[in-house]
Amino acid sequence: MNQLKNDRYLKALLREPVDMTPVWMMRQAGRYLPEYKATRAEAGDFMALCRNADLACEVTLQPLRRYALDAAILFSDILTVPDAMGLGLSFGAGEGPKFARPIENKAQVDNLPIPDPESELQYVMNAVRTIRRELKGEVPLIGFSGSPWTLATYMVEGGSSKAFTKIKKMMYADPKILHALLDKLADSVILYLNAQIKAGAQAVMVFDTWGGVLAHNEYKEFSLRYMHKIVDGLIRENEGRKVPVTLFTKGGGLWLEAIAETGCDAVGLDWTVDIADARRRVGHKVALQGNMDPSVLYAQPERIELEVKQILAGFGQGSGHVFNLGHGIHQDVPEQSPKVFVDAVHEYSKQYHK
């Protein structure tokens, strides 16, 4: 594989010295870019775009042509794994995901297959291989998956949810069924992420989008426990280099110490967390990723730069910070805002790495 020209992102995740703070954006390949909309229209629909390795590669590379980002992230969806389990995933126009066959009982859980990443999910691996080739070693490629808890919320609710009543009912009334589902999902995610690493992903990230809806003890039992299992099962070195893993629970600021205990290399922070406080709490153990409120990108350039400076100052001197948004970029931000953001991170972070 190609030698990396810019490994700032990988070094920061391992808390090794860098010349400036690396930056990328969650959902950086997406609807805020006009060229993405054109490629998606060419594909026909969202899952067709995910399943076409050349088009998935194209949308992965689009933001890198505009902005000086320090990493590329595979263009895919967290719901590829449950889709490969046969739940009948669809995306209606202007709607969120829907499953035709949501999980309601033990028999369904028992009958769920663990997908083979090189057969049912081969289209994802083909995309990873294609992207890695086309990146030509410019920046590292991040692979990813949803967390078992987050995947389970969609599988049990049948789609997106605001109250999570079905899965919480299962959690409190039939916890054994939910644990069996989460265990199967953890095994599936381990296979899936390891296959991405073998195909060329140089770092991986687990998105626990809905972990923050859980009560304190339930978070540890139903979300963190299974992310810990994943961390334990991952390939941590490939191509003669460490493969860092980042765990991100949206709304997870209460549990940073517990997340850091899993053995992950980095913890993602949403925008509700004070990064200075987070570094005091867990910075001796893990790198931190985040954590500007994505809505700041609606502001004037000076305001964006001010926010960047405040977060950089909050983290302070030295490596161990990957700058990012606290969640995915919004689709209607002004076109120049991401450039202002990325350039500000690079310009104003140099002083913290002398």
Swiss-Prot record:
Keywords: Cytoplasm, Decarboxylase, Lyase, Porphyrin biosynthesis. The keyword Metal-binding does not apply. The record marks D77 as: Transition state stabilizer. Its main location: cytoplasm. Its EC number is 4.1.1.37. The keyword Cytoplasm applies. CDD domains: URO-D. It is found in: Cytoplasm. Pathway: Porphyrin-containing compound metabolism; protoporphyrin-IX biosynthesis; coproporphyrinogen-III from 5-aminolevulinate: step 4/4. It catalyses: uroporphyrinogen III + 4 H(+) = coproporphyrinogen III + 4 CO2. Gene3D superfamilies: 3.20.20.210. Pfam families: URO-D. PROSITE patterns: UROD_1, UROD_2. InterPro entries: UROD/MetE-like_sf (IPR038071), Uroporphyrinogen_deCO2ase_HemE (IPR006361), Uroporphyrinogen_deCOase (IPR000257). It is an enzyme of class 4 (lyase). One of its GO terms (molecular function) is uroporphyrinogen decarboxylase activity. Substrate binds at R27, Q28, A29, G30, R31, D77, Y154, T209, H327. Disulfide bonds: none annotated. GO terms for biological process: protoporphyrinogen IX biosynthetic process from glutamate. Catalyzes the decarboxylation of four acetate groups of uroporphyrinogen-III to yield coproporphyrinogen-III. Homodimer. Belongs to the uroporphyrinogen decarboxylase family. This is Uroporphyrinogen decarboxylase. It comes from Actinobacillus pleuropneumoniae serotype 5b (strain L20). The gene is hemE.
